[in-house]
């Protein structure tokens, strides 16, 4: 009997490990440094087999495009940082855990937060690959070949080395979507609904980067007269991409899977989402309390703002449990003076301030 129990427990642990692996665990490239291209032999499969969290399709792409992998890791890291910035004042603050799932069990729930995380990480990959192309780091791409904008003045030159957002978009689509596309779920199943949700949000993230890329120009001429301009395509600051996706998070559409294997609005009174919108299939879990099942870390010990009425305020952040006050010593630059020529000298001032943490 004990041996049978051990078998059952082992099976449950195995299936749970598989669930964690099935999460979007290519994100783990952000936490594990990927060797630079010059550090390994082109076509050497062991390098890709040693990278944690890749699906079979992603592993094949790794073998074909090994020099891209460090930039995929950079893109994932950029996405995680932006997620943590955007949610820094929310109950769920995009915390990472120390395993290949990166965000833990909370990503197994098809919530708004999961939708944002998929979108912003896909956006990070587009951003990193596009820039690597421009900087000459990848052998398969170079500067942007985007067509000259029709509204660009005739006497302005088009052809500076721009960010190759077209290539970045295409490669990110092929790599990031591989995990969802290589699976064959039963039509109308919850698993298929979740896969379609992930694909929609991946696309929304990529499109945010693609659509927000804009023309940048540099002046040429005697004494800065700007008699001539050279222009190129340039990525938007990633913070602006994050802001755009946060707006999409706030207006994300609740969806459900149909028997025909398509996502439809859970409430038909709302507008159909566009490819640039975020969607979700599950309600968000309770982020107030720590819950091992849902992966919620809770808000106990989180800093809160006593005077704010927003999500960062102690009343909302602490979910009505109350908060503790403690004294904190902060060191800041003060009494700064400009000295000729040319530097600024400051003193260091210490201040004891009250801070508050959730019970």
From Swiss-Prot:
Keywords: Developmental protein, Disulfide bond, Extracellular matrix, Glycoprotein, Lipoprotein, Secreted, Signal, Wnt signaling pathway. GO terms for molecular function: signaling receptor binding. Glycans are attached at residues 93, 99, 291, 305. Disulfide bonds join 83-94, 133-141, 143-161, 217-231, 219-226, 288-319, 304-314, 318-358, 334-349, 336-346, 341-342. Palmitoleoylation is required for efficient binding to frizzled receptors. Depalmitoleoylation leads to Wnt signaling pathway inhibition. Residues 1-17 form the signal peptide. Gene3D superfamilies: 3.30.2460.20. It is found in: Secreted, Extracellular space, Extracellular matrix. A lipid is attached at residue 223 (O-palmitoleoyl serine). It comes from the Eukaryota. Belongs to the Wnt family. Ligand for members of the frizzled family of seven transmembrane receptors. Probable developmental protein. May be a signaling molecule which affects the development of discrete regions of tissues. Is likely to signal over only few cell diameters. This is Protein Wnt-5b. It comes from Mus musculus (Mouse).
């Amino acid at each position: 009997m004990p041996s049978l129990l051990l078998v059952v427990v082992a099976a449950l642990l195995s299936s749970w490990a598989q669930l964690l692996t099935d999460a979007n665990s290519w994100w783990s490239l952000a936490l594990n440094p990927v060797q630079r291209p010059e550090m390994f032999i082109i076509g050497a499969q062991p390098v890709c087999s040693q990278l944690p969290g890749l699906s079979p399709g992603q592993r094949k792409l790794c073998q074909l495009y090994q020099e891209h992998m460090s930039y995929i890791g950079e893109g994932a890291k950029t996405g995680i940082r932006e997620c943590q910035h955007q949610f820094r004042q929310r109950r769920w603050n995009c915390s990472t855990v120390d395993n290949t799932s990166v965000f833990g069990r909370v990503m197994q729930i098809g919530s708004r937060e999961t939708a944002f995380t998929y979108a912003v990480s896909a956006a990070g990959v587009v951003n990193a690959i596009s820039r690597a192309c421009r900087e000459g780091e990848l052998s398969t791409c170079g500067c942007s070949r985007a067509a000259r904008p029709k509204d660009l003045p005739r006497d302005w030159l088009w052809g500076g080395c721009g960010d190759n957002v077209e290539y970045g978009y295409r490669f990110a689509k092929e790599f990031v979507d591989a995990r969802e596309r290589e699976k064959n779920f039963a039509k109308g199943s919850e698993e298929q609904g979740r896969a379609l949700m992930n694909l929609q949000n991946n696309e929304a993230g990529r499109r945010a980067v693609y659509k927000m890329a804009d023309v940048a120009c540099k002046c040429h001429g005697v004494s800065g007269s700007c008699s001539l301009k050279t222009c190129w395509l340039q990525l938007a600051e990633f913070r602006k991409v994050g802001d755009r996706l946060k707006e999409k998070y706030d207006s994300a559409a609740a969806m459900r899977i149909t028997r025909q294997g398509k996502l439809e609005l859970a409430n038909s009174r709302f507008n159909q989402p566009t490819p640039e919108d975020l969607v979700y299939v599950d309600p968000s879990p309770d982020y107030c309390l720590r819950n091992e099942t849902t992966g919620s870390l809770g808000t106990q010990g989180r800093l809160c703002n006593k005077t704010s009425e927003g999500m960062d305020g102690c009343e909302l952040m602490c979910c009505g449990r109350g908060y503790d006050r403690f004294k904190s010593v902060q060191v800041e630059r003060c009494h700064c003076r400009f000295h000729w020529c040319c530097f600024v000298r400051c003193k260091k001032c210490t201040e004891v301030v009250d801070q508050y943490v959730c019970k």
